[in-house]
A protein has these predicted regions:
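PLP-dependent amino-acid enzyme catalytic core
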Residues: 1-471
């Protein structure tokens, strides 16, 4: 198993190299050269196993034998030992065929913990083995930053720099990034939106001299290992609901397309998924793209679901690569058009392939608030705004007799203002985070300029020691 770039002009890499590299040197994203395959019999054999045991079985083929089995098992056990629910990703039934998969039982109350806790341990292992250090950079629309900082805080071989849009994340999300006391953690409040933050991260990776000098590595879902870790909960959920002997549908609130692309990966690996439904807020570029066949950027609107206030969905490039039968030249042309003119057309055959696997829908701000209120009134279940988008769209895409699972991506207490406004309920933070809002903050406000960000990182990163070979 090795990994190839969606743009076809970077070298193929083994697992640990792809892990530490993040973004390919041609600007593309790494994907497995070949999808592992699981038979129905193998999927049935997962029944009755713990989340950790299933994770080991599903993820092992991706590691290419580069990590000893016992070491990999221990990493998985340690990563998910940080979760507050024994099932890691438990299911809650909200209707006859409707389920919510709760992905917020990790340390920062968001689905990003599922991948980030494992990613930190994988990176530690790879860096330790090589005697290297790394400078971790990440852009966040809210949840990635807190999850990454929690996972990497205090780790000796990494410095972490998280860029978030100043004034555009929830107060809880901001405190989870700005109250760490670890010396290796740096939170940068960028005077712009999430797309500005993401563009700065990509620009740093494309600045080869800077990238090599500070030993740059990434934790956004441009990093294949993030997607890989998220594949697991599609398998655990499907098996719990009778898979592979019945098909399951999933609705995923998404902006950057990473979480739902993990579902696509699971389907490619043999999991019998019926529908993968993209749920967007008013920043609906993914819904528009499926409808029109044209990917066109618009201005970002601020909503009550800030983690989805995105117009450039990085992981859509991975799906394009698959839809174009892995023709990297067509992906390069699309990405160049996006860069030059803010959009691109998807060829009819590729669009047909995408529509075969995906459906899409959007929820307005009014519909989000109404879904939070209605769900709580009818079932007693409290949703955060992102999960409410999923529930609203799922209700319109359900099929009789096919279970529909909505991924709940964050705890409602991360968005108390929106939740209280919609439901009248003031969601409390769990006891272990009760003092979060009283902690002292530490962050740097910075302009959305590459030079300013690189200068700050260059002054604070320790990654250029023990430089080693280029990645």
């Amino acid at each position: 198993m090795d990994y190839i770039s969606t743009r076809g002009e970077a070298p193929s890499l083994g697992f640990c190299d792809a892990l530490l590299t993040g973004l390919a040197r041609d600007g593309g994203l790494y994907v497995p050269r070949k999808w592992p395959s699981f038979s129905k019999k193998e999927i049935r054999s997962l029944r009755g196993k713990t989340y950790q045991e299933i994770a080991f079985s599903i993820l092992l083929p991706f590691t290419n034998g580069e990590i000893p089995d016992d070491t990999f098992r221990a990493m998985i056990d340690e990563a998910y030992g940080t979760f507050r629910h024994p099932a890691i990703a438990p299911l809650v039934q909200t209707g006859p065929n409707s389920f919510v998969m709760e992905l917020f039982h990790g340390t920062t109350l968001a689905f990003k913990d599922v991948a980030m806790q494992l990613l930190a341990r994988l990176m530690d292992y790879a860096l330790e083995k090589r005697g290297e250090r790394a400078t971790i950079v990440g852009a966040t629309s809210g949840d990635t930053g807190g999850a990454a900082i929690d996972a990497f805080a205090g780790r000796e071989r990494t410095d972490i720099f998280i860029l978030f849009p100043h004034g555009k994340v929830s107060p809880v999300q901001q405190r989870q990034m700005t109250t760490s006391t670890s010396a290796n953690v740096h939170a940068l409040a960028v005077e712009g939106n999430f797309d500005d933050c993401q563009n700065l991260v990509k620009a740093m990776f494309n600045d080869v001299a800077f990238r090599d000098k500070v030993r740059l590595s990434g934790v956004n879902s441009i990093n294949w290992a993030r997607i890989m870790a998220q594949i697991v909960y599609y398998f655990t959920t499907a098996v719990a609901l009778g898979g592979p002997d019945r098909k399951i549908s999933f609705t995923v609130p998404t902006g950057n397309f990473g979480d739902i692309f993990a579902g696509y990966c699971a389907k490619r690996m043999g999991l019998p998924i019926d529908r993968l439904v993209i749920a967007t807020n008013e920043n609906d570029i993914l819904t528009r793209t499926l409808k029109t066949g044209r990917y066109d950027m618009k201005a970002v609107k601020a909503t009550t679901s800030p983690s989805m206030d995105i117009q450039i969905s990085s992981n859509f490039e991975r799906l394009l690569f698959e839809a174009y039968d892995r023709d990297a030249s067509k992906v390069r042309a699309a990405m160049e058009s996006l860069k030059q003119s803010g959009g691109f057309e998807i060829a009819p055959e590729a669009l047909k392939a995408i529509r075969r696997d995906f459906r899409a829908g959007r929820a307005s701000e009014k519909q989000v608030a109404e879904t939070i209120r209605k769900t709580h009134t009818e079932t007693g279940y409290l949703l955060d705004p992102h999960s409410a988008i999923g529930v609203f769209v799922a209700a319109k895409k359900e099929k009789p007799n096919t279970p529909m699972v909505t991924l709940s991506t964050a705890h409602p207490a991360k968005f108390p203002v929106a939740v209280k406004s919609a439901s009248g309920i003031d969601p409390a933070l769990p006891t272990w985070l009760a003092g979060l809002m009283d902690r002292e903050e530490r962050f740097q406000i910075i302009k959305p300029e590459l030079k300013a960000v690189e200068t700050f990182i260059g002054q604070h990163a320790r990654g250029e020691t023990n430089a080693g070979a280029e990645r």
